[in-house]
Amino acid sequence: MPSLRLLAILTTLLAVVLIATQSSATRTTRRPKPQNTKKPPRGGGTGGGGGGGDQPARLGFRQTTTTMAPSSSLGTDETTEDTMTDAYSLSPTDSTTYAGDAYPTEFHTDSMALPGAGMGNYTLDYSHCYLNVCECCPPEKGRGPPGERGPPGPGAERGLPGVPGEKGDVGLMGPPGLDGMPGATGLEGDKGDKGDQGDTGMPGAPGILGKEGPKGDLGPKGEKGETGLPGLKGDLGERGKPGWNGTQGEKGDLGKIGPAGPSGLTGPMGQNGQKGEMGECPTGEKGEKGEAGLPGPPGPRGLVGTPGVNGTNGLPGPVGLRGQLGSPGGKGEAGGRGPPGLRGMPGPKGEKGPKGPRGVRGPKGPQGETAEQIRSAFSVGLFPSKSFPPPGLPVKFDKILYNEEEHWDPMLSKFNCTHPGVYVFSYHITVRNRPLRAALVINGVKKLRTRDSLYGQDIDQASNLALLRLASGDQVWLETLRDWNGVYSSSEDDSTFTGFLLYADPKA
């Protein structure tokens, strides 16, 4: 948008420059204005010496109207002005000195004055003349030498206003102007009336999750909800820790009677009985079918009979008529407990039950045997006479601070490992007069190194600490390297070497 505004401003400026150029090009050059003098009027003239307002008869006025042609970007410019013309010239022109310019050859007299214009005294101001003329003769053709530049004439008085010209025709409608610059922001209007309620808008996007609010107060206890659907089978839980040794509980009550076992196997069929003798009663007529009798009460359960001998299959009897369905009988009394059935097939493995409650803590057990506590430690220092020990050899720590287990050998200045395990070793060395390079050595292998670059009478401290695993029979000592043996000790400064067992390895 700023580029469009700049283009509009440049176009407007260009239009103004073009209008000004065309306006200056179409203006006619004014003729010199006559000067009123006190000379006597010419013959045939009228009027006294005070006729300064009359124009000379030889000069006339001509109204010139210039109309600008319409262009694509400029409007119509109509200019009307009154120009004074010389009676010798046909139209207003610029000054010229070329011989080719044409002028009328006839002689103009005072009779050419405009009607109603009186003859007055006047004198031409030659400094404003465009042609080589004089008062007594008309100009002649030809090109004269250029004259010298005359002095500027006095300021002329403003002439009378000319006759207003006729109203010109309405010009063609110009093209629409460029868009103007945006106006300033208007004043804030009054608050309008409340509009009608709009339709419900689309639901907005969910906002950003706000910060978690403070924990609310405990609400009232809700009503018991409906029983939910059974949950899915959970994963197998971890094996619980064994409970404490609890006391033996009392004997429980007798459990409920278990369900009846499966039916026993069918016993072998007994032998057929002997056929009975025919009765004496002759065969009577077949009687009518009697009504179905009421079901009798269930009889007592019979005793289990002895298994019969395998008999032969008898002849199948005639198919009897189907009797009517009897009404169900009443519930009989529970029979006695039958003998236990055979052991059934083992069922599938049941699911793991919930973790039971923790058992009661059992009684305190008897005191065990006291374990043998393994100890191994030492702490030694350096006497002042053993300061600056020779390099490459164990430092002679002969000032015993602790060595109850006698695992430190003062003759060799070495620690002998008796109990395998993890040991802690540390040393604090006072350094003076010369630099120090010390190393913690295990079986001839340097495991830990320390360096302190010190010269002069300054005193410094060098220390280190490490955990090392040792086997039975390992030896540990401290030694200096090369000529950097600035180990120092005095009545006010000590250099110490300490070690102790942290964890002993379990016995095999």
Swiss-Prot record:
It comes from Oncorhynchus keta (Chum salmon). Residues 371-508 form the C1q domain. The gene is otol1. Residues 170-182 have a biased composition (Low complexity). This is Otolin-1. InterPro entries: C1q_dom, Collagen, Collagen/C1q_domain, Tumour_necrosis_fac-like_dom. Residues 144-367 form the Collagen-like domain. GO terms for biological process: otolith mineralization. It is found in: Secreted, Extracellular space, Extracellular matrix. Residues 24-94, 142-371 are annotated as: Disordered. Homooligomer; disulfide-linked; probably forms homotrimers. Interacts with otomp. The lineage of its organism: Eukaryota, Metazoa, Chordata, Craniata, Vertebrata. Belongs to the OTOL1 family. Collagen-like protein, which provides an organic scaffold for otoliths onto the sensory epithelium of the inner ear. Acts as a scaffold for biomineralization by sequestering calcium. Selectively expressed in the sacculus where it is localized to the otolith, the gelatinous layer of the otolithic membrane, and part of the transitional epithelium. Residues 62-75 have a biased composition (Polar residues).
